Amino acid sequence: MSSEITEGDLQKFHDEHFNAKAVNLWNVAFAQNDRGGNSESANVEYTQSVERYPDGTIRTLTDEQILWFRESEKRELMWKKEKEQLLKEKELRQKALDKERMVSSKPETNPKTPISLKELKDIEIYQNQFHYSAYEILEEEKILDNIFRKFTALPIKYWPATPIRG
């Protein structure tokens, strides 16, 4: 078996792996200019072998590339719409949460006012219905108020947040 590669072997390999159009473009672009050939005739051959649009513009993208770009643009537009929709939903949720916070954070109109006789009668109705005395109901309300204060108080002191360095 001979380890030498002949010119015929190279020609056979070349013919099997490179198409005629690619070889022609290579020769037009590089080979003739290196040999000092006529560059104008090379440009004419090159421009004749390139695909053109009906208006004469040279076509630089294949149909597959154009399709891919269109699909990517469609995907990008869909993502933008989804993002806008998510932002709107988030904004609506935030507005609803802010409204809820405003309603729940309104101060009492008359805090720590003594209980009136009408309220005591209402408490007596509750006592008959739920079997609690007025005193027990008031104590339970105080306990619930204290629990509320405990959980809504901020345990963090914000000043100074970071050590002051000179």
From Swiss-Prot:
TM helices/strands, residue ranges: none
Superkingdom of the source species: Eukaryota
InterPro entries in the record: DUF3807 (IPR024526)
GO CC term, one of those recorded: nucleus
Keyword field: Cytoplasm, mRNA processing, mRNA splicing, Nucleus
Region (May interact with smn1): 1-58
Phenotype when the gene is knocked out: Inviable cell population. Degron-mediated knockdown leads to decreased cellular levels of Sm-class snRNPs and defects in spliceosome activity.
Localization terms from the record: Cytoplasm; Nucleus
GO terms of biological process kind: spliceosomal snRNP assembly
Keyword Nucleus: yes
Function of the molecule: The SMN complex catalyzes the assembly of small nuclear ribonucleoproteins (snRNPs), the building blocks of the spliceosome, and thereby plays an important role in the splicing of cellular pre-mRNAs. Most spliceosomal snRNPs contain a common set of Sm proteins SNRPB, SNRPD1, SNRPD2, SNRPD3, SNRPE, SNRPF and SNRPG that assemble in a heptameric protein ring on the Sm site of the small nuclear RNA to form the core snRNP (Sm core).
PANTHER family according to UniProt: YALI0F31295P
Full protein name: Uncharacterized protein C16H5.15
Organism field: Schizosaccharomyces pombe (strain 972 / ATCC 24843)
Source taxonomy: Eukaryota, Fungi, Dikarya, Ascomycota, Taphrinomycotina
